[in-house]
Amino acid sequence: DHGRAGLLGLFGGNSGPAHAAPKVTPTALPELPANAFSRIDDGDDSLFFAPPRLVTHIDAGAIAALSDFYRSIVRKGGAVLDLMSSWVSHLPEDLPLAEVIGHGMNAQELAANPRLTRWFVQDLNRDPRLPLPDGGCDAALCCVSVQYLQKPVEVFGDVRRLLCPGAPFVVSFSNRTFPTKSVAVWRSLDL
């Protein structure tokens, strides 16, 4: 199997730029065990992700399906945050966008992505707050990387802050992963 993909979630943005993201505490997911977001390799993510990996993590069929979905949900001419991006965004080439802001862990990969109009490197496991203004994004995407987040509730809450009212946040996932960097709860799933 070469990267089955699925859609994890989709939710609308905040109720307005003045709406603050909800306060998140470690008990925000009390139904999960305390070690749910631990990893086999808790070493520095910037070192692990330093070598550029110019590969796709889902197969051609999954890429086509994801691109078609993006075409149906991302507003033409909008500003998009491509969270945890790489050298390819899977956004349809024929979808005109005002801006695609890339976030990732590898500067070489992000610089190679032709869809990104600007990008930044940040370890969300160290700092889940994104350096972007409230309500400035018409969509946010997180493609096949959610399994690496140790603070997903905090990151998702901050993405909510960035979204315009009603803007979608599309989280896609695959059965392919770097297992030592994936969180325990993800490794326990039968994907």
Feature annotation, model-predicted:
Residues D1-L8:
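N-terminal export leaders
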Residues A21-K76:
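Class I SAM-dependent methyltransferase Rossmann-like catalytic core
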Residues A65-P131:
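Class I SAM-dependent methyltransferase SAM/SAH-binding core
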Residues C137-V153:
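A short SAM/SAH-binding and catalytic strip from SAM-dependent methyltransferases
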Residues V153-P168:
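A short glycine-rich, Lys/Arg-flanked "PGG" loop and its adjoining helix->strand segment in the class I
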Residues P168-L191:
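Conserved class I S-adenosyl-L-methionine
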